[in-house]
Amino acid sequence: REFEGNANMAAGVAVNDALQWHYSNDIWSFNPNKRKLAPHSNDKLSKDGAIAKAMEKFNEYVPVNETDRLKKEHYQETIPQTCQQGFIAFDKIGVQNSNKVVAEDSINHTDNRLSLPIVGRTDLHFTDFNASSQGVAASSGDHGSDAPFLSVLELKTSWQRPGRVRKDGTRSFSSAKLPSTPNILHLQQLAFYCCALRKQMPVSPYLIYLTEGDFIIFNEKNCADLEPVNLKNYYEQLVQNCIRKERLLARYVDLDEPDMILSEIAKDVEPMFDHPFYWNIGAKHYARAKEIWSTK
C-alpha cells in the first residue's frame, strides 16, 4: 500500500488484533496459496499474551512525521489500557461463552440495485448464544429466547490528541472521549454487515467504543439506531450513496484512458480538500489530486 498510515490507525489495529487473538476461533486472512482471503484457525492467546503480541506489532509502525512520532510514543502507554477496556466490554456481553467466534470475516454482498458488490470485513461475529442467558446481550427480539443467532460486533477506538508543549518541553495529551451516540458512518457499516449476514440466521448488532479508561456498548436494547427498522434505513442510506457513485462513474464508461476519466470527473466533482480525512492518501497521491483539480 502506498497510502500513509497514522499512529491512531495503527493503535486501533493493535487493540483489534489483541482482542481477536484472545477470543477468536477463526480469523480470516490472505491465503497466499489460494491467493484470496480464507479463514484460519486461531490458537487463542491469554490476555497478557495478546497485548504483548499486539504491542510488538505496533512497535514496528514507522511514524510519518514528528507529531505522529509523539503520538506513537504516547499510545505505547495507552494501548494496553485500551485493550483491558476491550476485554471488560467483550466479557460483559459474553463473547467468551461462544464456541464459534470469527474475526475479519470477508463479506461480499450483492444488492441487485448495484452493478458491483459491497465488500467489507467484520471485526467479530459469534454464534450459539441464548438470549435468555446473555444479560446485556439479550436482543429485543427477531428470534426466540432459545434460538441460536449471530451477534455482529463492530469495534471503534478513540485516542488522545497532542496538546500544548509543557514548560519542561514534553507534549501534553488530551483525554480521549467516548461518544454519546454512534457515528452515522459506523451505523451504516454495521447495518451492511447485519444485512449481509442475516441470510444465515437472525442477527444482533453491537457497536463498541473504547478509550484507555472506559468503554460504551451500543445495542438494540439501549440504542434505537440499532433496532431492526432503523438499521434497515442506515443500510438504505449506504446503498443510495453507492448508487449515486455508480451513476456518476457511468458517465465516463465510454472513455478509454484513465487520465481522461480523471479529467472529466474533476469537472463534475468538488474535491473538498479541506475534509478532515478524505485526503489522507499519502503525499504523492495528494499532490497528484491537487494537480488534476488545479487545471479545472
Question: At which residue positions do the language-model features occur?
Answer:
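Short amphipathic alpha-helical face segments that pack within enzyme cores
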Residues: A14-D17, L185-C195
